Each structure stands twice: as C-alpha cells, then as structure tokens.
Amino acid sequence: SIEKKNRALSLSNDFRMNKVTYGTFHSVFFRILRYFENYNIESILDEKTKRIGLKNILKGLNIENADDDETIGQVINEISYVKNELMDKRDFKSEVLTNDEFIKVYNFYEEYKQQMNKIDFDDMLIKTYELLKNNKAALDRVRSVYRYILVDEFQDINKVQFEALKLIANPSNNIFVVGDEDQSIYGFRGSRPDFLLEFEEYFSNTKKVLLDINYRSKGEIINIANRLIEKNTNRYEKVIKCGQGNGAKVNYISPEDSEEEAVYIAKDIKNKVQEDYTEYTDFAVIYRTNIQSRALVDVFMDMRIPFVVKDSIVTIYDHWAAQDILAYLRIGVNPNSNKDWIRIINKPFRYISKDNLNLIKDEPDFINSLINKCDLHPKQVKTINDLDIDISYVKGLNPKNAISYIRTTLDYDRYILDYCANRKIKTNGLIEILNELESSATNFKTIQEYLEHIERVKSEIVDNKNNKETDGVIFTTMHSAKGLEFKNVYIIGANEGTIPHEKSYEIDDEEKKNDQIEEERR
C-alpha cells in the first residue's frame, strides 16, 4: 500500500491525494475497528502465539500428530477458510480432522482468543463486516468517509470482504475495481473470481474496460498461455496480445522421475551460467507443492549450485508421516532411542497403552522393559518380539529398501489408510509424501549415510533462509511466485495429478491459471 501511495502521489500534484486512504483490506478494516470498538495493536494475536495456542488445543483433545507443524498449519488455514467464506463450521469438511474434532478445535480456539482478549487477522474482516451489518450509525459514518472505492487484484477477494464492500459502496456504488479472473489462484484461501465475473449483477451501470496487452513476456510465451487458459469455462472471453514482440524459447522435456528432472535443470542452469555469463539469480524453478522441491535441493546441494528457497523452511522430512518412517530408520541405527520407539510403537496399532509407555519411557532397554515390566497379553509380547526382529532386519537394508519394507511388511501404509479412513480424508497427499521420501533414499547405500544427508539438507535450508545475502537460483511455489518475474523459468512436475493437483478445490480452472501465470512470468 505504501508503494501504491507513492506512485499515486508522483502522478498528481493535487494536495487532496494525501487524504486518500491506502491499505489492504486488513489494515483498512482494522482502522475501522479501532475507531468504533477501541481495538489497538495489542489486541492482535501474533502468529507464534496463535500456533502455540492451537497446538495446545490439539494436544488437549488428544488429536494425533498434534505436534506436527504441517497439521497445525493446515488447521489454521481451514479455520481461516471457514471464516472468510462466512460458512457454518458444521458444514466444513476438514482434510486433517474429523468433523467433531474440527468443531471442537474451532470452538476452543474462539474461547482461547476471548480469554486472552485478542483477535486474529480473520477476525479483523469478520468483526468489521458484522459491525457494518448490525450498526447503522457506524455504516453511515464509514460510507461518508469512503465515498469512492478502488480495489486492486479484485479476483483475489473473498466472501466476507465482498459482503463488506457491498455494504460500504451502497447506495451510490462509486466503486472501481481492477482484476483478472484468469489470475485467481487462491481458492484454497477463500478467494473467488465469481465476484469479478458477476460484478455487473451486483453493481448496475458498470462500465468495463479490457486491458489486453501483456508487456512482460514475449509472443511465444503469450501464445502458449492463451492456448492453455482458453480451456477454462469460468472466465471472460479474451485473447491477450503481446507488447514485447517475439524472441523467447519454450522447451519441453519428459524426464523419468524427479531426480532426472532436477539433474537436467541443474546441468542446464550451470551450463548457461558458464557459457552466457548470466547470474544464478536470473533463474527460477517453480513448482506446485513444496514437496517437489526435495529433489531440487538434493541435486543442487550435490552440484554446489547456490539456491534460495522462497517458501517455508519446513522440508518433506519434517512431515509427521516422514518422521514416522525416519523414526523406524533411526531405531535401526540406535536401538536405544526411546523417543523413536514411543513414536512408532503404535504405528500401526500394536495395542500398547500410554500408561505402559510412560512406565518405561526412560528405561535403557526399551523392548526388554516393555516385555518384562509391563502387563502385556501373550499376543502383544509376540507382536513386540516380531517388531524387534523386523527392526534388526531393516538396519541391514539400504535405505530405499528399508523404507519399502516398513511401508509394506510392517504395514505402515495400512496404518495411513486406516488413519485417513477414520477421519474420512483422502490418502493421496500422505501417500505422495511417502513415495517422495522413498525416492529420496535411492542413491544411498546405508541408513546412517541417508540420515546424515537429511540433517545436512535441513541445516542447509535453515542457513539458506537466514542468509539474506544469498545469491542463487530461486526455488518457489506457484502461489508464492505470483506477481514476480524472472528471466529464465523452469516449471517442474507438469504431470496429471500434480498440475492440476488432486487436492485442488477447482481443478478444471484454477490450476490452468497457475500454469498460465507461470508461462507469462518469463
């Protein structure tokens, strides 16, 4: 908003421009709340406290994997989606919790904020909408202050923002919006291009101006983007023209797997840097999900090519399902790792109670203590002895075969299927993580070597993220790359089931927009 204000002021000498309010929905709405309901900066719940609070709520409800950062993040996103859509929480289908669990977590989170006298960023929108809807004096005052409204990136607004906008703009309807439904890729956050497409139904006498020239990309790229996006049905019919002429190259490759793909890209970039005297910062590798960055990180580290990860520093190895498999491997290397024994002893379920685990959690010989100090049924004893034998076998395998053995012979995949069935959620995402983890172990001879590699990767990514001066190839997701531009772009994993992604809310349209935007980025 500061950038937009400075640009506006540079284009006009009218002193009244200084009186214009510039801001995001959150900042403008929070200003309204501060005026009418006496909120202040101290009222805002910071993200760290929010995550800690939700983590404690999940643990208090004995929800499995409550410590997992990705699970916590997913729950945060789902609560946000429900609020931004003005949904009844009972109608929402969570991808990580059962319906009952989600409702309980939602309610406890609301109580948690009330006890702390805090609001989060979603509340800024909800509470402003409710204020304007229920308080005529407040609505009239806001209308008198904001008689003219301009909204940029209108394709990205959500339901609560749109409903509040309609209240403020009515009855004069002096509203000017700029947007492109072809660039709406945030459906998972509640953004809806429908509000742009149906704008004329809500605001009469609308005048529409088509901005159909792209000044960023060359003709070859624009043509491909047009051919892709025209397959969408939920859009205004238009053909984007090129304002840059021709001269770009668009190449396609068909690698056998993610490793071969990463090696090809790494070699291609290295050759271009050496031959053309370009910089590593001139290159970006863009992917649909963070999981896909795993092979890139491995290969670029091995080839000593500098890179910058723009998204979360959480790696595939941090996911709870991957951590379960790695716990099995760590036990193979160190059978005295009680923490890892406790993690996997009931994955799959082996009917060992929490009381028994608490009784022996600090014992030096976990398995012997479990058998001899706990009151186990003979069938349980046999199960534990069989597990001990299996672990001894696993430690002699190479890591890829060891992971395969854990998934099949030790029934970890069956545990995942049961876990998803009990929660009525799809298995695709978790199986994808396990497949990628198994693939990551391909080139290692011993489990110890593989585990050491994982620690190096995690350390490298943390250092990479903390080093603000790192010069290197950009690794980023499509969503994080929106609005940026690069000289050379590689889009990886353009496979059915990845782009469009199986978990996508609007597979037919929104995922084509991802590809179209990435094509135009070059």
Question: What residue spans do the PLM features occupy?
Answer:
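Conserved beta-strand -> loop -> alpha-helix junction used to position metal-binding or nucleic-acid-contacting
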Residues: 17-32, 303-327
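Helicase P-loop NTPase motor core
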Residues: 204-207, 212-306, 332-334, 396-397
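Short, polar/flexible loop-turn hinges at active-site or ligand-entry regions and domain interfaces
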Residues: 12-19, 35-47, 57-70, 86-97, ...
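Short glycine-/polar-rich loops that comprise or flank the Walker A/P-loop
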Residues: 17-20, 171-174, 180-182, 203-208, ...
